[in-house]
Swiss-Prot record:
This is Uncharacterized protein DDB_G0282307. Its main location: secreted. The lineage of its organism: Eukaryota, Amoebozoa, Evosea, Eumycetozoa, Dictyostelia. GO terms for cellular component: extracellular region. Residues 27-58 are annotated as: Disordered. The keyword Signal applies. It is found in: Secreted. The keyword Disulfide bond does not apply. Residues 1-19 form the signal peptide. Keywords: Glycoprotein, Secreted, Signal.
Length: 96
């Protein structure tokens, strides 16, 4: 569980750093968590995606999968586009 907590903290930090801060209608991108754990008969569902930036150009799309089989594995893919000029992609994988 502490691996998932650490991963969520990293995701939130990236959201703050790459949130939309330009334009008169600037707003932080929002993220949602959730999804279900998969099993051999039912696949895991995905967590929510980040919200769009206030000016319509910046957005952060956060995608995290958590699967429990023999080990705990957390997969997160973060993609940020800031003002159509900066493209940032980060991947993290933690296994217990």
């Amino acid at each position: 569980m502490k691996f998932l907590s650490a991963l969520l903290l990293i995701v939130l930090l990236i959201s703050v750093v790459f949130g939309n801060t330009s334009g008169p209608s600037s707003a932080w991108a929002t993220t949602t968590t959730g999804g279900t754990t998969g099993s051999q008969t039912s696949p895991a569902t995905h967590g929510g995606h980040g919200g769009n930036g206030g000016n319509g150009h910046s957005n952060i799309d956060i995608h995290a999968d958590v699967g429990l089989l023999d080990t705990l594995s957390v997969h997160a893919r973060v993609k940020a586009n800031v003002a159509d000029t900066v493209n940032v992609k980060a991947k993290a994988r933690v296994e217990a």
